[in-house]
A protein has these predicted regions:
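Catalytic machinery of carbohydrate-active enzymes
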Residues: 1-333
C-alpha cells in the first residue's frame, strides 16, 4: 500500500478546491493511504473527509522550530509520494527533509500573475483554474472531480435542530456578506436592496452567515424574514447551514466555495479577484457576476491590494438588480 502526502496549508477556498485533487489521487491510487497537511486553524474544514486517512496540522504561530519538527516527523513517515499543491516558502523548507525524487510540486503562474496585476497583460488560457493546476501533478488536464466536503449524521441532526430553534424552514437563502479583505465585499446598500427584493419576490427566509470580524453583517437590515447568524455558528455548523440552503450568495470567500462542496449552488460576486486567481465556481447551477471589461482587474491574488483608482469600479458597477436577476433565475431552475 502506498503512503501519500498531500500538502495544502491554506486558505479556506483553496483547501476546498484541493478536495477535487484528493478524489483524483484516490482514483489513481485506490489502495493508498492518504495524509493531508494543513494549517491548524483550517483543519476543521476537511474533518470527516472519507478520503483523508490522517490529518496533519501545522501551527504557524510556533515558528521555524515547529516547521523543522514537522519536517522531521514527515520524514519519519516514509511517504512513497508527496504532492505539494501549495508551493510556498514553508513547503519548500519541508521539501528539504523529504526525498527529492518523491516530492512533486505545482508550478505556480507567478510571472503571468505579475504581468496581469502590474502590466495588465493576460497570458492565461481561458480554461485556467486552480483545480486544473493541481491536477498537472497527476498528468490530467481535462475533466476533474467535483469538490466535496462532509458532515456526519450527528452534525446533520444538530444543524437541523439549530435551524428549527431559529424557526428557519427549508425555504432559505444563505448570504455571506463578509470577506477576508474589504475590497472583496459588495456594498451594504446593495446587499440590503437585494435582500428586500428576494423577500418580496420569493418570500424566502434570508440567513446571514459571518464571523466576529465580519462587521458588515451588523449593518444588514432587520426584518422578520432575516435571521442573522453572525458569530453564532462554528465553521462545521455553517457548513451544515449552507448544505440545506436553496442557494448561497457571497463574494470570493471561503463559505462560498464550501457551499458548492456541500452541493448548494452559489452566486459569487467577483471584484478584485477572478478565475486567474482561483476565483471561479464549479457547479453547473452556480453563477459568477463580475465586470469583465475593466483593465484594472484582477489586481491581486487574494483581493488584499488597496484599490488605486478613485472608485472601486469592479464592485460599485455591480448593482443589486443585476445580482437579483441572476439569483432569481437560479431559484426558479
Amino acid at each position: 500500500m502506498k503512503k501519500i502526502l498531500v500538502i495544502r496549508m491554506s486558505a479556506i477556498g483553496d483547501i476546498v478546491l484541493a478536495t477535487s485533487f484528493l478524489e483524483s489521487v484516490k482514483q489513481k491510487y485506490p489502495d493508498s493511504e492518504i495524509h493531508f497537511l494543513i494549517k491548524k486553524e483550517f483543519s476543521d474544514i476537511v474533518k470527516k473527509h472519507p478520503i483523508i486517512d490522517k490529518l496533519i496540522s501545522f501551527d504557524k504561530k510556533l515558528g521555524l522550530n515547529e516547521l523543522f519538527r514537522l519536517g522531521k516527523f514527515l520524514r519519519s513517515n516514509n511517504y512513497d509520494i508527496i504532492f505539494d499543491i501549495h508551493s510556498v516558502f514553508r513547503t519548500r523548507v519541508l521539501s528539504l527533509f523529504l526525498r527529492k525524487n518523491l516530492f512533486k510540486q505545482i508550478k505556480k503562474p507567478r510571472l503571468r500573475r505579475f504581468l496581469l496585476f502590474y502590466g495588465y497583460k493576460n497570458y492565461f488560457e481561458e480554461s485556467f483554474s486552480h483545480i486544473k493546476m493541481y491536477h498537472t501533478l497527476l498528468g490530467q488536464d481535462k475533466t476533474f472531480p467535483q469538490t466535496n466536503l462532509y458532515i456526519d449524521q450527528l452534525e446533520e441532526d444538530k444543524t437541523k435542530q439549530f435551524l428549527r430553534e431559529d424557526n428557519i424552514g427549508n425555504n432559505y437563502i444563505a448570504i455571506v456578506p463578509g470577506a477576508a479583505w474589504s475590497q472583496k465585499q459588495w456594498s451594504i446598500d446593495n446587499y440590503n436592496n437585494l435582500i428586500k427584493k428576494l423577500i418580496r419576490s420569493f418570500n424566502s427566509t434570508i440567513v446571514i452567515l459571518g464571523s466576529t470580524n465580519d462587521v458588515i453583517c451588523d449593518k444588514i437590515i432587520k426584518h422578520d424574514k432575516i435571521i442573522n447568524l453572525k458569530d453564532k455558528t462554528s465553521l462545521r455548523m455553517a457548513m451544515g447551514v449552507v448544505k440545506y440552503a436553496q442557494h448561497t450568495l457571497g463574494s470570493d470567500t471561503g463559505l462560498s466555495h464550501i457551499s458548492e462542496a456541500m452541493g448548494t449552488p452559489v452566486t459569487m460576486i467577483l471584484g478584485p479577484t477572478s478565475k486567474e486567481t482561483g476565483a471561479r465556481v464549479t457547479l453547473s447551477d452556480s453563477r459568477v457576476i463580475e465586470n469583465k471589461d475593466l483593465w484594472c482587474r484582477p489586481c491581486s491574488q487574494n483581493g488584499s491590494r488597496p484599490c488605486y483608482r478613485k472608485e472601486q469600479y469592479c464592485m460599485t458597477e455591480i448593482d443589486s438588480e443585476k445580482v437579483y436577476s441572476n439569483v432569481s433565475r437560479a431559484l426558479t431552475l
